[in-house]
Amino acid sequence: FMLADERRRGDRYVLAMPVRLEWKDGNGQTMVEEGLTENIGASGALVHLPRGLPEVGSIVNLYVIDEKNREVAVEAEVLRLERNAAHPQAALQLVSSIEKWQKKLYDKAPKRIAALHASDEYDDF
């Protein structure tokens, strides 16, 4: 059991990566939604899902595509939802494969962000 303020450890990185979420709805129907990460942390992510959101408390399969177009698959619990019609989001807490997440995504995030900003410098015409 963790208190809300203890759950989030470490930095969160603002990084948009393609994601796919799969979960079962209340009727047992498999739901699939695609979107983007808003930010990632050491053990979770905030994701933007434009069409549909899973329920709070549900367990989802989260697939994130890294910069080399490889899929990183983890399991996560939906902690909260932002039901903003223009920008719906789900806050996810990993429940499996946390070390894989950190090694393949979180630990590489600062370098990836720096590379994105470096390429932006050349866009100022």
Language-model regions: role of each:
Residues F1-F125:
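Structured alpha-helical
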